[in-house]
Amino acid sequence: MKKTRKIVTATVFALYIFLLIHVLFFRYGRSAAAGIDGLSYRLKYAANFVPFKTIRSYAAAMHRIPRVAVLNVIGNLALFAPMGILLPAAVPAMRRPMRTLLFIFVLIVAVECVQLLLGLGSFDVDDIILNFTGCAVCCAIYFSVTSRKNDKA
């Protein structure tokens, strides 16, 4: 039974990673905006380095475009949330909460940087905040549940 659970967990984790890569880099037929000119443009006009700027703009726009605002915030909260459960469940080296959270934080920042450098999406510090928050909540739930199981055993 334990081996079956490991196989299922690893399979679900692999599928999640595949879907995550697709959503982050290949949805909507994205293509890289090449060259330094593209990067300088993205840095100047398409990147947000100010924490909560995008979140505040969505909050301000709730009465005009509620669907876009809600979908963006909830989508960013949910995007990395499964990672908070699947990573420690599938990878024994990630069975410590701080190690898991640090790894995922670095991963999220790296994803945003790749999006900026390649022009596959945009860099937004609020995406980092929301992605990490969703992940941290699920990570806390995972470690809370698994520590209770270990206490009972």
Which residues make up each language-model segment?
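Bulky hydrophobic segments
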Residues: 1-120, 125, 139-153
